[in-house]
Amino acid sequence: MAAKKVDVLLIGGGIMSATLGVWLRELEPTWSMQMLERLDGVALESSNGWNNAGTGHSALAELNYTPEDDNGNIKITQAVNINESFQISRQFWAWQVRNGVLKNPRSFINHTPHMSFVWGDENVAYLEKRYQALKASPLFAGMEFSTDPEQIKKWVPLMMEGRDPSQKLGATWSPLGTDMEFGEITRQFVSHLQSDQNFDLQVNSEVSDIQRNADGSWRVTYTNTKTDAEQVVDAKFVFIGAGGGALHLLQMSGVPEADDYAGFPVGGSFLINENPDVTMQHLAKAYGKASVGSPPMSVPHLDTRVLGGKRVILFGPFATFSTKFLKEGSYFDLVSSVTTSNAWPMVRVGIDEYPLVEYLAGQLMMSDDDRFAALKEYFPNAKQGEWRLWQAGQRVQIIKRDEEKGGVLRLGTEVVAAKDGSIAGLLGASPGASTAAPIMLSVLEKVFKDKVATPEWQAKLRQIVPSYGTKLNDDPEKVREEWAYTAEHLQLPTPPQIDLEALKGAGAAPAGAPVKKVPDIAL
């Protein structure tokens, strides 16, 4: 069988592969590319709008990104890093809108304030400390903090009506928040790529073999899931952006770099309300804090979503468990991913992360009434008949071999690449799609290191991402410029003013003490 030859093969038709394809189309327009997707179309797994929470993750509201150390100091480093990454995404999308790659911004990004919403003396004190700590960064300008029920009611009336007036509450509100439809971005990116004769999309195409050729390229065999016809493609560079399917494919390639990894699948479900009388009264993504005694997985949040042009409200997530690595995967995914090199790390994580096991067991035992009771903590006047339970996508958390501990559960995403850069894959879950542009930029820096260093690529990278190579957190004026530029092209509200005097007053955070390790799973 004669193999088709391409410069780049993208395995998986989600936001990651589509984003990398668009990056490469900008940087090397003559390169030939093929994309393989096992389902009937692109963006049908985790990138699909109904299969994720659609948060434009920029650490404005997610409390697990600002842990408290043993001395009571709030650590904002991770929050700043995640926000920096999201600013790269904003610039990347703004450039694509300018160039007609992405169409109407309202179809994929919508202004949705991000809030943290907590109750109880200890949690309110923590939230105020967090608010004060974030004043040291220009990236969090415009954030407001309040313990006044009347003010909080102006922000989120649904969350306040019917609430016990004696309950001690605290909330922060940021005008910089967004709701994202990553499925729409994916579809528009792939549509743009398809307009070029150097790009070929094959759907219903499942990879069955990945072998190294003598010349260093990769021979990938795939089967049409409708006809069973087998085809072969030779690629100089292979990117595995297959979500939960990426670990299997990396293992299939035989690259030793994959030996360090195992995966643990966790799903998430949400309660959904589509009644316009309710959905039009809530405009926020309001994140809570994990209850005492349970590890902060993805903490509960009550979210405005815009899906297919329609406003809906989601509440969750509730953890679910399946041995599948993909929503449309196989129940044998987990067991078939176990190898002699990753079995022990998985056992160690199971022992060390026992609170996770307890948490998942508790989540799986929840009844409809239990889930509704959790919702009422955030939306006291909710009516049970208006909500339905929806199973969202699967996430596969990274378990990585560790010399000291045997194995550790890793947060975030990791790029796993062969030493020669000829094949790379993306493992992990959070913050995921929000940071697809910077994550794929890190893939370019890892596997095309020499090209990234050329004046041609450097100039193009800075054209697409004007802040490339700089830390926005250290340059308030650049933050102001970037916000104004991206807000204009993404049709977002005028960004808040940055108070330079407040930044000076905040000063540097204390050195601090160790931060207690908390198990965390991204749903």
UniProtKB/Swiss-Prot annotation:
Keywords: FAD, Flavoprotein, Oxidoreductase, Tricarboxylic acid cycle. Its cofactor is FAD. PANTHER family: L-2-HYDROXYGLUTARATE DEHYDROGENASE, MITOCHONDRIAL. This is Probable malate:quinone oxidoreductase. It holds the Pfam family Mqo. The keyword Flavoprotein applies. Belongs to the MQO family. NCBIfam families: mal_quin_oxido (TIGR01320), PRK05257.1-1 (NF003603), PRK05257.1-4 (NF003605), PRK05257.2-1 (NF003606), PRK05257.2-5 (NF003609), PRK05257.3-2 (NF003611), PRK13339.1 (NF009875). GO terms for molecular function: 2-hydroxyglutarate dehydrogenase activity; L-malate dehydrogenase (quinone) activity.
